[in-house]
């Protein structure tokens, strides 16, 4: 579906969204503003919510794009709902969406290798719902991960671009 949408939409920028997640009202505007810096593709940060949609925390440990996940400095990730891609780029890279669980990881690995000019909005505008599928991590994953990242970056998270520390 994600690969096909590149050919079905009539827009300059394509945002993606899984059926169990949602976006903040300022998501698209923050994406568009970040694209004005000349990027091929952009990503936002995400909030973590329980299965009923209640806020748990900001994700400062997994879906960080330029920065590795907390448990392995060799693994990088961006959640599907955080991606926004210029349509012309999406058409050329769309084949990288495989359609199975983990497709966002496979897609991210492909796009970051082929299109190295990308940026982060620095805003938590995507909302990820825990327990959306059987492979979903639990809230303890984020509690542990955020605590470790707070120790790793005591002077502020670099993905925020403002060198500020978010309390977890």
Language model: regions and residue ranges:
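Nucleotide-sugar donor-binding/catalytic module of glycosyltransferases
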Residues: 1-168
């Amino acid at each position: 579906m994600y690969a096909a949408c590149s050919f079905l939409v009539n827009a300059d920028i394509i945002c993606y969204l899984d059926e169990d997640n949602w976006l903040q009202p300022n998501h698209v505007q923050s994406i568009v503003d970040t694209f004005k810096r000349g990027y091929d593709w952009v990503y936002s940060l995400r909030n973590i919510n329980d299965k009923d949609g209640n806020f748990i925390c900001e994700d400062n440990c997994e879906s960080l794009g330029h920065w590795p996940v907390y448990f392995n400095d060799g693994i990088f990730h961006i959640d599907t709902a955080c991606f926004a891609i210029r349509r012309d780029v999406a058409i050329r890279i769309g084949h990288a969406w495989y359609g199975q669980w983990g497709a966002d990881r496979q897609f991210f690995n492909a796009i970051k290798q082929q299109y190295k000019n990308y940026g982060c909005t620095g805003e938590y505008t995507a909302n990820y719902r825990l327990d959306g599928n059987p492979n979903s991590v639990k809230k303890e994953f984020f509690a542990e991960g955020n605590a470790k990242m707070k120790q790793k970056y005591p002077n502020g998270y670099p993905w925020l671009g403002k060198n500020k520390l978010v309390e977890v």
